[in-house]
């Protein structure tokens, strides 16, 4: 196992806001499922279960990195990092980035020299306290409210809803576009009903 590396550097503006406010749906999503644990699902205890309609709830796990005093600061933890002479960085192995309330986990992350965007791939998860998005690949613009994820699954914790999309794009503050998407409030592995668009 490699040595863990942590580093903190300042950056500007937001990484990813709360998800799906005003989202538009188009086409039909691929039928892939994730295990309940991968969607931050927790079953009710035996004492809680009789009073509940559903079998559990979505609960965000604790952040892996501590909050920084300056919410614009980008904190990074990884097993390996390669720096190029021009300032580019490739982070590999259990990469975690946190900025404000948003935390990104992935197997590989590429940071260009200008640090204006993050390209992440491999078992990625983005959490911001209100939502979880999992996907295969993501590009996040660090100085703008823009992001793009392919083959994503999403959860809104407080609304008890989940879905998936072949493409999820944040096009501005609280503006999202989903392609080939689904939406449901059913428990994981249960699709008694869902919207498909």
Predicted feature locations:
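Gram-negative bacterial Sec-dependent N-terminal signal peptides
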Residues: 2-28
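Structural signature for solvent-exposed beta-strand/loop edge elements and short helix-capping sites
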Residues: 30-197
